[in-house]
Amino acid sequence: MNDKKKLKIAIGTDAFPPTTDGISNVAQSYAQIINKNLGEAVVVTPKNPNQLDYRYDYQIYRYKSWWLPSKEGYSIGWPFKDELHQDIINMNFDLLHSHAPLATSYYFRRVVEKKKIPTVLTYHTKYEYDFDRRVPTKAARDFAYRFLLNNINAADEVWVTSKGTVDSLRKVGYEGEYIVMPNGCDLPITNVSDDDIALIKRKHNIPNNIPLFIYTGRMIWYKNIELILDACAMLKNEG
């Protein structure tokens, strides 16, 4: 018999469906797997006017946010009210695991100021690219970097998803230790009929008997799109 205590874990993320990105998918995978047989996981994420949380068989706690009407569909978390911090404390979590070093990590920082709960931060993406590209003034960029770094430094453990992400951590000023913790997302296995394949090919004018490469992700250079294009060009030149 396994006598180990099953933990109650907060899975913090700034993005969750209907907003879809890599972090959103990882947060779903964590919640599904933990709730299946490892313990209890509750997703902590900003409110979204298009949320359909009834579709999930685990608890999702939504906190106040500001909605940005954009193609990405992101909400900006606003975790500043004391009652929001008390809500997390009242849930009696054993661990706070943030997958976003911005609003939700700051939320967890405020909670820990009132009640000490172990925290883990997984650093997924290269925020310096987004800051440098989207934040218009140096003063605002400096504030964004300080905010990001303070949230990272506040965690008891910092995880990265690959060795390559460590360079980004160092660029934003983090000098502490880290753990490389690879992750992945389970995808359902489906059987697609020959008729369905033929229909899709006709719809998108895809010729038969040629290799098909599909990229799913944000159209931004640091996602290695240039590498993909160069590789495709090399294959074309080689016939």
Q: What do these predicted regions represent?
A:
Residues 95-128:
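An aromatic- and histidine-rich active-site surface loop
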Residues 207-223, 229-232:
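Conserved donor-binding/catalytic core segment of Leloir-type glycosyltransferases
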Residues 182-191:
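Short beta-strand->alpha-helix junction loop in the catalytic core
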Residues 27, 34, 213, 228-229:
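A structural motif in glycosyltransferase catalytic domains
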Residues 191-206:
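A short helix/loop element that forms part of the nucleotide-sugar donor recognition site in Leloir-type
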Residues 1-64, 88-89:
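N-terminal subdomain of nucleotide-sugar transferases
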Residues 47, 164, 184:
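Carbohydrate-associated surface elements
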Residues 118-120, 128-150, 196:
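Nucleotide-sugar donor phosphate/pyrophosphate-binding loop at the beta->alpha transition
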